[in-house]
């Protein structure tokens, strides 16, 4: 019997926490409980990452199901929640958040047409601030370095590789503003995504460019847009 996508994601997440995270069961249960509470809405973890990127500040989330507060304290970071608290350094939180985002982000099938938010392509493409970029997803889990991969690679719609010097655009799930048309998806595709996530995220210890440290960001920026030579 096949596991559902959510069941597979939970299985991968627990395996990573138990075997690779160096967290105690009490510590990683805090993250698992938050994941279970937010379901498919990963914005809480993106907001936590914003605090890491800015180096200071505080993020607070509060609803009827749980509260979460994420704060920088003297060079370390504290996550407080309805399920407990944990204090870790910058790199530990970056690693954990990147795994959560990569494992639980929805993976759209090949041929999906999406509008990308221009905010994530400033100075990389000749577009206005309010414009979106329409692309067709042509590849997923594209290796970049031994540690990093691009979640999606696409071509500009409707021209593709013709009539422009832009051959490919590499992007992450957070850049997707709208799904215009979803490509063909079946059981075989679902199994492929699960196999690739396990291979890259668990077995090989890689992560996508969705969540990056300062050092990693400098390596990635010039490769987001691939131009014809």
PLM segments and residue spans:
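Long, low-complexity, charged/polar intrinsically disordered regions
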Residues: 49-85, 90-101, 115
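Short linear motifs at secondary-structure transitions and domain/linker junctions
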Residues: 54-55, 88-92, 104-109, 127-134, ...
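Short, charged beta-turn/beta-strand-edge "cap" motif at the junction between a beta-strand
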Residues: 117-124, 128, 141
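Intrinsically disordered, low-complexity, charged/polar segments
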Residues: 91, 150-229
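Mixed-charge, Lys/Arg-rich low-complexity intrinsically disordered regions
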Residues: 20, 28-34, 81-121
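Hydrophobic transmembrane signal anchors and adjacent membrane-proximal interface regions, especially
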Residues: 3-4, 14, 88, 132-133, ...
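Basic/aromatic-rich interaction segments and small domains that mediate binding to polyanionic partners
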Residues: 60-76, 128-183
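N-terminal intrinsically disordered, low-complexity, charge/repeat-rich segments that act as generic
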Residues: 1-73, 228-229
């Amino acid at each position: 019997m096949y596991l559902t996508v959510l069941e597979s994601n939970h299985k991968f997440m627990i395996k990573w926490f138990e075997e690779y995270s160096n967290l105690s069961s009490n510590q990683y249960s805090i993250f698992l409980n938050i994941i279970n509470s937010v379901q498919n809405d990963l914005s809480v973890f993106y907001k936590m990452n914003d605090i890491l990127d800015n180096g200071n500040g505080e993020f607070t989330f509060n609803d009827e199901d749980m509260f979460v507060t994420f704060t920088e304290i003297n060079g370390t970071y504290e996550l407080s929640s309805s399920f407990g608290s944990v204090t870790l350094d910058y790199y530990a939180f970056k690693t954990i958040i990147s795994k959560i985002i990569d494992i639980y982000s929805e993976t759209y099938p090949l041929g999906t047409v999406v509008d990308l938010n221009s905010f994530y392509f400033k100075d990389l493409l000749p577009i206005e601030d309010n414009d979106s970029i329409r692309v067709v997803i042509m590849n997923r889990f594209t290796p970049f370095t031994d540690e990093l991969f691009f979640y999606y690679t696409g071509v500009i719609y409707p021209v593709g590789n013709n009539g422009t010097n832009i051959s490919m655009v590499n992007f992450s799930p957070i850049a997707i503003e709208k799904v215009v048309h979803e490509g063909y998806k079946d059981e075989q595709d679902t199994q492929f995504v699960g196999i690739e996530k396990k291979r890259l995220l668990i077995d090989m210890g890689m992560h996508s460019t969705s969540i990056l440290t300062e050092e990693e960001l400098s390596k990635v920026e010039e490769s987001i847009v691939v131009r014809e030579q």
